Protein backbone atom coordinates (compact mmCIF):
# COMPACT_ATOMS: atom_id res chain seq x y z
CA UNK A 1 0.00 0.00 0.00
CA UNK A 2 1.61 3.24 -1.14
CA UNK A 3 2.30 6.25 1.09
CA UNK A 4 -0.27 8.56 -0.47
CA UNK A 5 -2.95 10.78 1.11
CA UNK A 6 -6.14 8.92 2.00
CA UNK A 7 -8.09 11.13 -0.40
CA UNK A 8 -6.06 9.64 -3.26
CA UNK A 9 -6.65 6.06 -2.14
CA UNK A 10 -10.41 5.95 -1.51
CA UNK A 11 -13.64 7.53 -2.76
CA UNK A 12 -14.21 11.04 -1.42
CA UNK A 13 -17.18 10.14 0.74
CA UNK A 14 -15.09 7.44 2.35
CA UNK A 15 -12.17 9.81 2.77
CA UNK A 16 -14.43 12.03 4.88
CA UNK A 17 -15.90 9.07 6.78
CA UNK A 18 -12.44 7.75 7.63
CA UNK A 19 -10.94 11.11 8.57
CA UNK A 20 -11.03 10.22 12.31
CA UNK A 21 -8.65 7.31 11.63
CA UNK A 22 -6.47 8.85 8.91
CA UNK A 23 -3.39 8.50 11.11
CA UNK A 24 -4.20 4.84 11.73
CA UNK A 25 -4.51 4.24 7.98
CA UNK A 26 -1.07 5.78 7.51
CA UNK A 27 0.28 3.62 10.32
CA UNK A 28 -1.08 0.48 8.65
CA UNK A 29 0.61 1.55 5.43
CA UNK A 30 3.90 1.77 7.31
CA UNK A 31 3.26 -1.65 8.85
CA UNK A 32 2.72 -3.21 5.42
CA UNK A 33 5.82 -1.57 3.95
CA UNK A 34 7.82 -2.86 6.92
CA UNK A 35 6.48 -6.35 6.24
CA UNK A 36 7.72 -6.15 2.65
CA UNK A 37 11.09 -4.78 3.77
CA UNK A 38 11.42 -7.76 6.11
CA UNK A 39 10.72 -10.18 3.29
CA UNK A 40 7.14 -10.93 4.29
CA UNK A 41 4.41 -10.64 1.67
CA UNK A 42 0.80 -9.75 2.31
CA UNK A 43 -2.53 -10.22 0.58
CA UNK A 44 -4.34 -8.73 -1.27
CA UNK A 45 -2.01 -6.74 -3.53
CA UNK A 46 -1.25 -3.25 -2.26
CA UNK A 47 -3.53 -1.49 -4.72
CA UNK A 48 -6.48 -3.63 -3.55
CA UNK A 49 -6.11 -3.29 0.22
CA UNK A 50 -8.59 -0.39 0.46
CA UNK A 51 -10.67 -1.47 -2.53
CA UNK A 52 -13.92 -1.75 -0.54
CA UNK A 53 -13.70 2.00 0.05
CA UNK A 54 -13.34 2.93 -3.63
CA UNK A 55 -17.08 2.60 -4.26
CA UNK A 56 -19.34 5.52 -3.24
CA UNK A 57 -19.99 5.83 0.49
CA UNK A 58 -23.36 7.46 -0.16
CA UNK A 59 -24.55 4.51 -2.26
CA UNK A 60 -24.11 1.82 0.39
CA UNK A 61 -27.39 0.09 1.24
CA UNK A 62 -26.06 -3.27 2.36
CA UNK A 63 -23.07 -4.29 4.46
CA UNK A 64 -21.66 -7.84 4.31
CA UNK A 65 -18.89 -8.39 6.85
CA UNK A 66 -16.04 -10.86 6.42
CA UNK A 67 -13.23 -11.72 8.82
CA UNK A 68 -9.98 -11.30 6.90
CA UNK A 69 -8.82 -11.86 3.31
CA UNK A 70 -8.39 -15.29 1.79
CA UNK A 71 -4.83 -16.40 2.67
CA UNK A 72 -4.44 -18.40 -0.55
CA UNK A 73 -2.27 -16.47 -3.04
CA UNK A 74 -4.32 -15.30 -5.99
CA UNK A 75 -7.64 -15.36 -4.14
CA UNK A 76 -7.93 -12.11 -2.14
CA UNK A 77 -9.12 -9.09 -4.14
CA UNK A 78 -10.01 -6.55 -1.45
CA UNK A 79 -13.73 -7.37 -1.24
CA UNK A 80 -15.00 -9.80 1.40
CA UNK A 81 -15.84 -13.26 0.02
CA UNK A 82 -15.02 -12.21 -3.57
CA UNK A 83 -12.29 -13.75 -5.71
CA UNK A 84 -10.80 -12.99 -9.11
CA UNK A 85 -12.83 -14.22 -12.10
CA UNK A 86 -10.32 -16.95 -12.98
CA UNK A 87 -10.16 -18.61 -9.55
CA UNK A 88 -11.12 -22.29 -9.67
CA UNK A 89 -12.26 -24.04 -7.60
CA UNK A 90 -14.11 -21.46 -5.55
CA UNK A 91 -13.35 -21.12 -1.84
CA UNK A 92 -15.83 -23.34 -0.03
CA UNK A 93 -17.44 -20.47 1.89
CA UNK A 94 -18.12 -18.62 -1.36
CA UNK A 95 -19.47 -21.79 -2.98
CA UNK A 96 -21.91 -22.07 -0.08
CA UNK A 97 -22.90 -18.41 -0.49
CA UNK A 98 -23.69 -19.15 -4.12
CA UNK A 99 -25.71 -22.25 -3.22
CA UNK A 100 -27.83 -20.11 -0.89
CA UNK A 101 -28.05 -17.36 -3.53
CA UNK A 102 -29.50 -19.88 -5.99
CA UNK A 103 -31.87 -21.42 -3.46
CA UNK A 104 -33.03 -18.01 -2.22
CA UNK A 105 -33.41 -16.13 -5.50
CA UNK A 106 -33.82 -18.87 -8.09
CA UNK A 107 -30.93 -17.58 -10.19
CA UNK A 108 -28.44 -19.96 -11.81
CA UNK A 109 -25.06 -20.36 -10.18
CA UNK A 110 -22.72 -17.51 -11.19
CA UNK A 111 -20.05 -18.32 -13.73
CA UNK A 112 -17.26 -17.06 -11.45
CA UNK A 113 -16.62 -15.80 -7.93
CA UNK A 114 -16.19 -12.11 -8.76
CA UNK A 115 -18.60 -10.08 -6.60
CA UNK A 116 -17.65 -6.72 -8.12
CA UNK A 117 -21.21 -6.20 -9.47
CA UNK A 118 -22.54 -6.27 -5.91
CA UNK A 119 -19.99 -3.66 -4.83
CA UNK A 120 -20.98 -1.47 -7.77
CA UNK A 121 -24.66 -1.70 -6.78
CA UNK A 122 -24.35 -0.55 -3.18
CA UNK A 123 -23.15 -3.63 -1.28
CA UNK A 124 -20.13 -2.94 0.93
CA UNK A 125 -18.09 -6.16 1.03
CA UNK A 126 -15.90 -5.38 4.03
CA UNK A 127 -13.44 -7.57 5.87
CA UNK A 128 -12.79 -6.57 9.48
CA UNK A 129 -9.07 -7.04 8.83
CA UNK A 130 -7.91 -5.89 5.41
CA UNK A 131 -4.65 -7.83 4.97
CA UNK A 132 -3.15 -11.23 5.79
CA UNK A 133 0.13 -13.05 5.34
CA UNK A 134 -0.05 -15.71 2.61
CA UNK A 135 -1.04 -19.13 3.95
CA UNK A 136 -1.35 -17.72 7.47
CA UNK A 137 -5.01 -16.99 8.33
CA UNK A 138 -5.72 -14.26 10.88
CA UNK A 139 -2.04 -13.24 10.91
CA UNK A 140 -2.83 -9.50 10.75
CA UNK A 141 -5.60 -9.48 13.33
CA UNK A 142 -4.93 -7.11 16.18
CA UNK A 143 -2.47 -5.04 14.13
CA UNK A 144 -4.80 -2.05 13.75
CA UNK A 145 -7.22 -2.71 10.91
CA UNK A 146 -10.14 -3.26 13.27
CA UNK A 147 -10.03 0.37 14.40
CA UNK A 148 -10.35 1.50 10.78
CA UNK A 149 -13.11 -0.86 9.72
CA UNK A 150 -15.14 -0.18 12.85
CA UNK A 151 -14.86 3.55 12.10
CA UNK A 152 -16.23 2.80 8.63
CA UNK A 153 -19.17 0.88 10.08
CA UNK A 154 -19.93 3.64 12.60
CA UNK A 155 -19.93 6.18 9.77
CA UNK A 156 -22.46 4.12 7.83
CA UNK A 157 -24.66 3.70 10.88
CA UNK A 158 -24.59 7.46 11.51
CA UNK A 159 -26.25 8.22 8.18
CA UNK A 160 -30.01 8.63 7.81
CA UNK A 161 -30.28 6.33 4.78
CA UNK A 162 -31.77 2.83 5.20
CA UNK A 163 -29.26 0.00 5.39
CA UNK A 164 -29.21 -3.74 5.99
CA UNK A 165 -26.20 -5.36 7.66
CA UNK A 166 -25.67 -9.06 6.94
CA UNK A 167 -23.59 -10.60 9.72
CA UNK A 168 -22.44 -14.17 9.09
CA UNK A 169 -20.89 -15.96 12.05
CA UNK A 170 -19.89 -15.11 15.60
CA UNK A 171 -17.04 -12.77 14.68
CA UNK A 172 -19.28 -10.57 12.54
CA UNK A 173 -22.04 -10.69 15.16
CA UNK A 174 -19.82 -8.82 17.62
CA UNK A 175 -20.36 -5.73 15.45
CA UNK A 176 -24.10 -5.70 16.08
CA UNK A 177 -23.90 -3.03 18.84
CA UNK A 178 -22.41 -0.60 16.29
CA UNK A 179 -25.38 -1.20 14.00
CA UNK A 180 -28.23 -0.95 16.49
CA UNK A 181 -29.69 2.25 15.08
CA UNK A 182 -33.08 3.18 13.65
CA UNK A 183 -31.99 3.24 10.02
CA UNK A 184 -30.28 -0.17 10.04
CA UNK A 185 -31.67 -3.70 10.22
CA UNK A 186 -29.32 -6.57 11.04
CA UNK A 187 -29.66 -10.05 9.53
CA UNK A 188 -27.67 -12.68 11.43
CA UNK A 189 -26.92 -16.31 10.65
CA UNK A 190 -24.11 -18.83 11.02
CA UNK A 191 -21.09 -18.37 8.76
CA UNK A 192 -21.18 -19.96 5.28
CA UNK A 193 -18.01 -21.93 6.00
CA UNK A 194 -18.27 -25.72 5.64
CA UNK A 195 -18.05 -26.03 9.42
CA UNK A 196 -21.22 -24.05 10.08
CA UNK A 197 -23.25 -23.58 6.89
CA UNK A 198 -25.55 -26.48 7.69
CA UNK A 199 -26.32 -25.05 11.14
CA UNK A 200 -28.51 -22.24 9.87
CA UNK A 201 -26.80 -20.47 7.01
CA UNK A 202 -28.50 -22.63 4.42
CA UNK A 203 -32.13 -21.58 4.28
CA UNK A 204 -31.52 -18.18 5.88
CA UNK A 205 -32.54 -16.33 2.67
CA UNK A 206 -30.31 -13.29 3.27
CA UNK A 207 -30.68 -11.85 -0.22
CA UNK A 208 -34.46 -11.83 -0.54
CA UNK A 209 -34.86 -10.80 3.11
CA UNK A 210 -32.53 -7.87 2.54
CA UNK A 211 -34.61 -6.62 -0.36
CA UNK A 212 -37.86 -7.06 1.55
CA UNK A 213 -36.41 -4.95 4.37
CA UNK A 214 -35.03 -2.25 2.06
CA UNK A 215 -38.33 -1.89 0.22
CA UNK A 216 -40.18 -1.78 3.53
CA UNK A 217 -37.90 1.09 4.62
CA UNK A 218 -38.56 3.01 1.42
CA UNK A 219 -35.28 2.19 -0.32
CA UNK A 220 -34.66 0.46 -3.61
CA UNK A 221 -33.83 -3.26 -3.64
CA UNK A 222 -30.42 -4.62 -4.58
CA UNK A 223 -30.00 -6.30 -7.94
CA UNK A 224 -28.23 -9.42 -6.68
CA UNK A 225 -28.01 -11.14 -10.05
CA UNK A 226 -24.48 -12.10 -11.10
CA UNK A 227 -23.33 -13.19 -14.56
From Swiss-Prot:
Coiled coil, from the record: none
UniProt-annotated catalytic positions: 68 (proton acceptor)
Enzyme's top EC category: hydrolase
GO biological process: base-excision repair, AP site formation via deaminated base removal
Catalytic activity: Hydrolyzes single-stranded DNA or mismatched double-stranded DNA and polynucleotides, releasing free uracil
Compartment(s): Cytoplasm
Transmembrane segments: none
GO cellular component: cytoplasm
Main subcellular localisation: cytoplasm
Gene3D superfamilies, sorted: Uracil-DNA glycosylase-like domain (3.40.470.10)
Domain of life: Bacteria
E.C. no: 3.2.2.27
Assigned keywords, A-Z: Cytoplasm, DNA damage, DNA repair, Hydrolase
GO molecular function, one term: uracil DNA N-glycosylase activity
Database matches in SMART domains: UDG, UreE_C
HAMAP family with a match to the protein in the record: UDG (MF_00148)
NCBIfam families according to UniProt: PRK05254.1-1, PRK05254.1-5, ung
Family: Belongs to the uracil-DNA glycosylase (UDG) superfamily. UNG family.
Function field: Excises uracil residues from the DNA which can arise as a result of misincorporation of dUMP residues by DNA polymerase or due to deamination of cytosine.
Protein name per UniProt: Uracil-DNA glycosylase
Taxon lineage: Bacteria, Bacillati, Actinomycetota, Actinomycetes, Mycobacteriales
Amino acid sequence: MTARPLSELVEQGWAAALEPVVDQVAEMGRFLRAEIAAGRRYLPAGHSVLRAFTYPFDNVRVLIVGQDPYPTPGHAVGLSFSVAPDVRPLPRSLANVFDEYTADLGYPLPVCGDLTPWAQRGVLLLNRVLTVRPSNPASHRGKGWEVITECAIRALAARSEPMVAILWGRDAATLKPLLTVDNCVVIESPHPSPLSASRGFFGSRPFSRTNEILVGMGAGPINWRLP
